[in-house]
């Protein structure tokens, strides 16, 4: 993501997965996804990579919303804890910046399922690059 570019976090992969931006600003972002059959693993549960992608997208957008014009950010690492299985319905990721230096941002995303059940918590470190 680069300031002045798309910045919505809804890149090609996010669109392919059906991830939708809901809100973004002031170091926060919310993205949603409707679970589809092709999101399920062979056990009938949403694949962890889908939940991870939703959290990553929300965290990147949250940090992007706090960047200066011309800056960009990219994921360095993410740790995710899966707390409950999801088999259908809606998923929502709410992300926020919890720490920042000149070159890195630390973010948290909480992913909720239908009824507000917490299904995953992720923390991520992102690299911040200045305009060239």
Description of each model-found segment:
Residues 1-132:
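Terminal targeting signals and extreme-terminal segments of soluble enzymes
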């Amino acid at each position: 993501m680069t300031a002045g570019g798309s910045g919505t976090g809804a890149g090609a992969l996010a669109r392919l997965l059906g991830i939708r931006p809901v809100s973004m600003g002031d170091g926060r972002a919310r993205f949603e996804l409707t679970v589809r059959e092709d999101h399920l693993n062979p056990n009938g549960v949403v694949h962890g990579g889908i939940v991870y992608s939703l959290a990553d997208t929300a965290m990147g957008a949250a940090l992007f919303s706090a960047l200066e014009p011309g800056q960009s950010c990219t994921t360095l690492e993410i740790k995710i804890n899966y707390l409950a299985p999801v088999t259908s319905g809606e998923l929502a990721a709410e992300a926020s910046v919890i720490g920042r230096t000149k070159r890195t941002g630390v973010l948290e995303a909480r992913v909720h399922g239908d009824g507000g059940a917490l299904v995953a918590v992720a923390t991520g470190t992102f690299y911040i690059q200045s305009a060239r």
